[in-house]
């Protein structure tokens, strides 16, 4: 866990990728997030999820956790409906499926990068 904690401490922003299980994020991800506290503080976070409702319910729960950990979750996220995911993997055009995600993913990453830079500057000036 020391390597995990150190990796979080050295990073300025995060993209969490999770499936949705029983209306929530993967337990192993939640456990890994909960293991660390001060290293998350005042850093930006974004979310990519997949599931029956695009994983939206797992992201809702992770946003609440992120706020409690003093992370700053960006508004935009990428939700991949499992029906669309399976269609692409069962002989469908995987490239087309990925292309559909390019615009929302790009907007989310742009937002994450802006907040990451702003919060990094703010953390440095507070030290």
Please report, for each region that a protein language model flagged, where it lies by residue.
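Glycine-rich phosphate/pyrophosphate-binding loop and the adjoining helix
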Residues: 74-127
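Helix-loop-strand module that forms the ligand-binding subsite of alpha/beta enzymes
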Residues: 1-72
